[in-house]
């Protein structure tokens, strides 16, 4: 009898395939949810990922778990961007660039977040908010230490400003308005006039 730990077999490749299938499902879901909203067809997502519906449901038993995975993936991307910006030469420009990315994230993910809030445990929302606030805090503190951001500004102030802009401009016809409003908010963030 061969011990279990030395048995040859395709166990590792299957786990690798399963991981790739999950990644493809999240990638496809991200695209389909962006195009069609959180109520998009799960069959369309499976088809775009190149897997069957059974594979989708083995990985994500319901729509909410798939929505949560997509939201976490998007937040990972947003927070990873903040981490990379921590090494940028200009703390001021790094903060502004990340806030622009956060505004885009908030505008694109409104329906996704709203759908999750209806059915998903509160802990997901709290975790997402904490991660975004931590990313904002790291960039804000760096700008404050360099003297380009107001010292009395809290990370939650920035997060609320950006979310407010995203909510206020959800149905505007002027596509440039969210960016203009963010630039006005950025002017209020700075302790001194920003370089052009």
Regions found by a protein language model. Give the residues of each.
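C-terminal peripheral helix-coil segments that are non-catalytic and often amphipathic
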Residues: 1-9, 134-149, 171-196
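Basic, helix-initiating cap at the start of DNA-binding domains
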Residues: 1-48, 65
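Short, hydrophobic secondary-structure boundary micro-motifs
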Residues: 41, 111-117, 148, 152-153, ...
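Short hydrophobic/aromatic patch on the recognition helix
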Residues: 50-60
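Alpha-helical DNA-contacting segments of helix-turn-helix folds
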Residues: 60, 67-74
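Short secondary-structure transition hinges
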Residues: 65, 97, 103-138, 164-171
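Hydrophobic alpha-helical connector segments
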Residues: 69, 76, 80-107, 124
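All-alpha amphipathic helical-bundle segments outside canonical DNA-binding/catalytic cores
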Residues: 124-128, 145-160, 172-177
